[in-house]
Amino acid sequence: MFRGDFKGLVQKLDYIKGLGFSAIWITPVVLNRSDYDYHGYHGYDFYKVDPRLESAGASYQDLINAAHAKGMKIYQDVIHNHSSRWGAKGLFTPKTYGVRDAQWSWYYDERNDGFEYDGLTVEPKSGKSYYNGDLWSTAEPTGNTCVGWGTPTGHTSPEGYRIYNCQWPSPTSGMFPKALYHNCWIGNWEGEDSRSCWIHDDLADFNTENAQVQNYLIGAYNKYIDMGVDGFRLDTAVHIPRTTWNRRFLPAIQERVTQRFGAEAAANFFVFGEVAAFVNDKWNRGSVNHSAQFFTWKERKEYSADDEKAALEMYDYEQQQGTAAQPVSDNAFLRGNAYHTPDRSRFSGMNVIDMRMHMNFGDANNAFHNGKDSDDSYHDATYNVVYVDSHDYGPNKSSERYTGGTDAWAENMSLMWTFRGIPTLYYGSEIEFQKGKKIDCGPTCPLASTGRAYFGDHLAGEVTASDFGKVSSASGKVADTLAAPLARHLQRLNEIRRAVPALQMGQYSTEGISGSMAYKRRYTDAASGTDSFALVTVSGGATYTGIPNGTYTDAVTGDTKVVSGGTLTVPAPGKGNLRVYVLDLGGKNAAPGKIGTAGPYLK
C-alpha cells in the first residue's frame, strides 16, 4: 500500500492468481500531495496517475492490460469526498501564508516558476521531490478570503517558532471557497455534519452538491473507466449524501461504462462503498443515514431539484422514518430450497463493504450470526464485500492487524469463501503478515514496523500460475510463502468456490438447519441451464431437514450421501475445516466430487 509500484504488481500477478484470486482492489492511483506519502488518499491531481507508481513498461494502463490478459480484474479505490489539504489541481488550490525568515526558511522552498510538482521529479533549487514553493506566498494573493492573512496568531510551534494566520490549510479560516469546499469540522459523526464537514486536516472536504465539483470528479473518473478498470471502491462513501450518489455519481459511472463498453459491461462494473459504521449492531447507533445498508437503496421519494436542499430534505425524512420503516429485501435468501430472480428495481448502484461482519470478526461464529441478522436490510447482501481486517482497522475497530491465530484465520476464511458475499483478503494475511502490529501510527514509527509494511520481500523469486489456485512452478521466497498453511487453505477454498456456482452467486437459508455455522445455498440460471445446490457447515456438525432428496457429494472429502427422507446429518469436521455437500443434478449440474487435495485444514 505505501511501497511498491505497478511493475512489481505486474510481476506478481501470477502469485495472486496462483492463490486463486480473480480480482485486485488497489488503493487510489491519482497524484497524491502530502509530503512523502503517495497512497492516493490525499489526491491532488485527480486526472493524473501518480508517477511514483509507474515506470518504463509498467504504466497503470499496462497493469490493467496485464491483469485482463490473465483473466483478472482491477478494482480501483476512488475518492469523491475530499482532496488533499492542498486542494485539487484544476479545481482549486489554496495559497498559504509563508515567510522565509530565520525560523521558517527550512520549511518554505524558494518558488521555481518553471517547475511543476509531480511527486517524483526533484526540484533543483530545494533538492526535494516534495517541493512546496508553489503553495505559499508572503504577499496576499488576489481574491484571498483567508481571515487575518499573515498576522501572528500569538501561538508558537513545539520548536518555539512564531505561527501566523493562514499558514496552513484549514476549513474554518476562509481559505477554501464555500462553493467548492465545506468550511467546518465534523462535530457529530452520526449527525448531518458528518456529510458536510472535514474529517481531518489532510482531507479537504469537497462540496459534492456543487455542479462544478461534480463535473470535476466525474471527468476524472471517466478517464479510469476509459482505461478499462473493472470497478470502483468508493472511499468515505458515508460522508456524501445518498441523494448525491444516487443523482449524480452513480448514474455517471453507469452512463460512461455503457457509452464506452456497452450495457453488459455496465451491469458488470462492480461498485462498492466504504460506509464506515464502526458498531456491532444492525444500524449505526440508530442513524439510518450513517448505516452501510442504507446506501444500497434508491431514493423512495422526490426531493428539491437543488442538490444541497435535497440532501438536507432526504436526511431529515429518513431520520424521521427511522430504522423500522426502512425497506427490506429477500434478494439474499432462498425461498424454501428454491432460488428466485432478485428484484433489482430498487438498487442504487452501490454495493457496500460488510462493516457489521468486519466489526464482529473477533471470531467467525460471531461474524456469521451478526451478518445474517442484517441481510434483509441490504438491497442484496450476496454482493457485500466481506473481510476480516484491512489497511484501516482490524475487527471491532482494532488498531492492530488480526491476531486471532492460524486456526481462527482458517475458520474465518472457510466462512467467507462459502457464505454469501464476496470474500476479500488484505495482503499478507495468507501468512499472518505483521499480525498484532499497529496498522498505522502516522509519522511516529517506521512503516516497516506497522501493518502496512512492504510485503514484497516475501514474494522474491519466480512464480507461474497455470490457472486460478494452481501454481505450476515457484522458486525462491515466494515458494515458501505459497507453502504456508493459510496460503494452501486459500488455494483450495478458491478451487472449491469456483467449481460450485451456489457458493459464488447463490442465495442462502438457515431454515430447517441445526448447527452453529451451517446453511444451504442455491443458484439457478435458466439461460445457461445452471442449477447448483449445496449444504455447507463450517467447523461444527449440522443436520439439514426439508432438503431435496438425491445424492450429495462433499467437495472437500468426496464423501457421498443419499438422501431419501429429506434429512442429512453431517459430523463436525473440526475448527477451520468445512463440508460442502453438493446435490448431484446430473449433466452439467452434476456434483463435481472431491475438489483439490487435502491440506492442513480442508481434509
Task: Name every feature range the model reports, one short phrase each.
Residues 63-71, 81-82, 123, 127, ...:
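Active-site-proximal helices and loops of the catalytic beta/alpha 8
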Residues 22, 230, 423:
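Short acidic/polar active-site loop segments enriched in Thr and Asp
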Residues 27, 49, 235, 240, ...:
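Conserved residues at the C-terminal ends of beta-strands
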Residues 395-401:
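Surface-exposed cleft-lining segments at the edges of enzyme active sites
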Residues 1-12, 18-22, 28-227, 248-260, ...:
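Substrate-binding/active-site clefts of carbohydrate-active enzymes
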Residues 25, 76, 233, 425-426:
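A generic structural-conservation signal
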